[in-house]
Every structure is written in structure tokens, then in C-alpha cells.
A protein has these predicted regions:
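Conserved glycine-rich cofactor-binding loop
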Residues: 12, 19-20
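Active-site helix of classical SDR
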Residues: 128, 170, 178
């Protein structure tokens, strides 16, 4: 990205779900900004290792295979990142699942409900818990931030999403978690914010965005007239972790082309 300087030089960032989509774009952008980056993946080892190599190899960027569906999984991922780079300054909790098939609440399987909450919420709790403990014990000067946490939500967390109540519930909870954590952690020098994308051109949303009937309807509902690129979500995430955002905490930043405004 033109204009990205080494604003995160000397910092270590952990990005969950970093092998594709918004996560991969964020890994690339943070590496360009000078950070050492650890990121998690669950499948597609070759893709993850290719991204690791693209962003500088194990000395600068490391891919960590990790299931994320329990608090213990979150703890394990933070521990692996700290083993790789010795510290942790930034956590971006990006991973999550969204099933493209409609699931009306009367027909939704309990297994789907519990799986979505486990991945999208339970593991985030573990990630945040372990990251905060690590940030708290790291030495810093009074002028330095102890750490930055960015959670990834969705417009569904504010507007709801028919036939995808499981997903919307988790994202609404992430919004609330952001504000609660900000109030709790700001006095300790840890800023917590959230980025809430709308429709983004990623593999997760491809079935809907590329559908010949649904795709144009999605674009028509966005004032800017198109879906976002993954890079356009990664940019605000990076911004929130830099000194330019040094007085921002507890915010849910909508990055959706104005879509919430016409909800």
C-alpha cells in the first residue's frame, strides 16, 4: 500500500485467521508496516507457508497451525506467537465462520449454533485473555502503549442478519466485548477497538457476492456501489494500531461503504 511507512517497526502482531481474505491482507499490510507477524491458520498449510515466505520468512513472519474453537485454543495460539517472537504488542482477532446457506431459526441445528459461538466467541475470549496477560507483564516506558487489540465484527452485529442469527449474535457480542474491554484495559495502557466490515470480496462470501442474482442486489444496497476489497478492511485495522489512533479506544469502526447508514 502506497504511503505505508514502518509505523510498527519493532512491534509484534498476532493475527488469527491470517491465511486468507481479510486476515491475509492484514498480515501483508502489517509486515509492510515493519511489524513481525505471527498468524494462525487451520487448513491449507501450503497457502499459509507461501504467505509466511512472502512476508519475510520465519524471522519476520510465522504461520501457526491452530484450531480456534475453545478458550484453551486461544491461549495456545498466544503462547506460540510469544515463543516465536518473544513478546506481543498487537492482537487482531480476525478468525471466524459464516455459513452461506440460510438457516432459519426454527430449522437451525443446535450443532451449528454451538459451533458458530465456539469459533466466533469462545476462542476470542481465550485469545484476549492470554494476550492481555502477556501485554501486562511486558516492560514499557510511560509513553508507550502496553498493547493494541482489534476485534473483527460485522455489520450483522448491529443490524442483525435474517437466517444467520448464529453469526449475528456472535458479532453483536464482539461489539459489546470491545466496549467492556476498553473500559477495563485503557487504564493499563491497552487500547481495544473493533472493525465492523460489511460485504467484502473474500472466499468466505464468494458464493453470495458472485451469485448472478444476489450479487447485484448486494452491491445496490451499498452507497459506494460495490463490495470492499480485503485490503480496504486491513487498512483501518492497521490505523487503529498506530500512534495516529492513540486516543481512540472502545470504538466500533464501520467499514462498509455507508451501508449501515441506509439500513
Amino acid at each position: 500500500m502506497a504511503g505505508v511507512s514502518l509505523v510498527l517497526k519493532g512491534r509484534v502482531a498476532l493475527i488469527s485467521g491470517g491465511s486468507r481474505g481479510i486476515g491475509a491482507a492484514t498480515v501483508r499490510l502489517f509486515a509492510e508496516a515493519g511489524a513481525r507477524v505471527a498468524f494462525s491458520y487451520r487448513q491449507e498449510r501450503e497457502r499459509a507457508l507461501a504467505l509466511e515466505a512472502e512476508c519475510g520468512g520465519p524471522e519476520r513472519c510465522v504461520a501457526l497451525e491452530q484450531e480456534l474453537s475453545t478458550p484453551a485454543d486461544g491461549h495456545a495460539l498466544v503462547a506460540a506467537a510469544v515463543r516465536a517472537f518473544g513478546r506481543l504488542d498487537v492482537l487482531v482477532a480476525n478468525h471466524g465462520i459464516w455459513l452461506p446457506e440460510d438457516a432459519p431459526i426454527a430449522q437451525m441445528a443446535e450443532t451449528q449454533w454451538r459451533r458458530t459461538l465456539a469459533v466466533n466467541l469462545d476462542s476470542v475470549f481465550g485469545l484476549v485473555q492470554a494476550a492481555v496477560a502477556q501485554m501486562d507483564r511486558q516492560p514499557r516506558t510511560p509513553a508507550e502503549a502496553a498493547g493494541h487489540i482489534v476485534l473483527i465484527s460485522s455489520t450483522a452485529g448491529q443490524r442483525g442478519e435474517a437466517n444467520h442469527a448464529d453469526y449475528a449474535v456472535t458479532k453483536g457480542a464482539i461489539n459489546s466485548l470491545t466496549k467492556s474491554l476498553s473500559s477495563e484495559l485503557a487504564p493499563r495502557g491497552i487500547r481495544v477497538n473493533c472493525v465492523a466490515p460489511g460485504w467484502v470480496a473474500t472466499e468466505m462470501s464468494a458464493a453470495a457476492v458472485q451469485d448472478p442474482e444476489l450479487g447485484p442486489k448486494i452491491a445496490a444496497g451499498i452507497p459506494l456501489g460495490r463490495v470492499a476489497s480485503a485490503r480496504e478492511i486491513a487498512g483501518p485495522v492497521l490505523f487503529l494500531c498506530t500512534p495516529l489512533a492513540g486516543f481512540i479506544s472502545g470504538e466500533v469502526l464501520n467499514v462498509n461503504g455507508g451501508a449501515v447508514l441506509v439500513g
